[in-house]
């Protein structure tokens, strides 16, 4: 069984991709920025719930503050999507302009989320389709443009 994706993992991903914190460059994460990142994640997920509906994210209770060890409830495949979207928000908090590469990565991840959550409607015909004159398979009466079935016009032209 895979380890559940935590809120702290998403925030660390966003901080790392933004270049704000990284273990490779020994830049430690400030506790205040980490806490703000988790709160930003909660806000981001509330906004994404409007567009995508329920993705399975587990919001923290109103009485308690979210922590980094809380399970997010999201599948692991959404780590990059949420991380890149959170990264864009965090960069604006720090007054840093995102690079075109960061914006392209965030857009590609968001498009992947759109594709993954897309629900294709059934292509079967509806039962309440209107049947017009052209779709009517029974022949119309003599007062109509079409002749009745079984009626064969005889040659009434006197010349032939």
UniProtKB/Swiss-Prot annotation:
What would you give as a GO molecular function for this chain, any one? hydrolase activity
Q: Name one GO cellular component term.
A: virion component
Does this entry carry the keyword Transit peptide?
no
Where does it reside?
Answer: Virion
- Is Hydrolase tagged as a keyword? yes
Question: Which keywords appear in this protein's UniProt record, sorted alphabetically?
Answer: Degradation of host cell envelope components during virus entry, Degradation of host peptidoglycans during virus entry, Hydrolase, Late protein, Viral genome ejection through host cell envelope, Viral penetration into host cytoplasm, Viral short tail ejection system, Virion, Virus entry into host cell
Kindly give the Pfam families that the UniProt entry links to this protein. Answer: P22_Tail-4 (PF11650)
Q: Which family does it belong to?
A: To phage P22 gp4.
Q: What is this protein called?
A: Peptidoglycan hydrolase gp27
| Organism field | Acyrthosiphon pisum secondary endosymbiont phage 1 (Bacteriophage APSE-1)
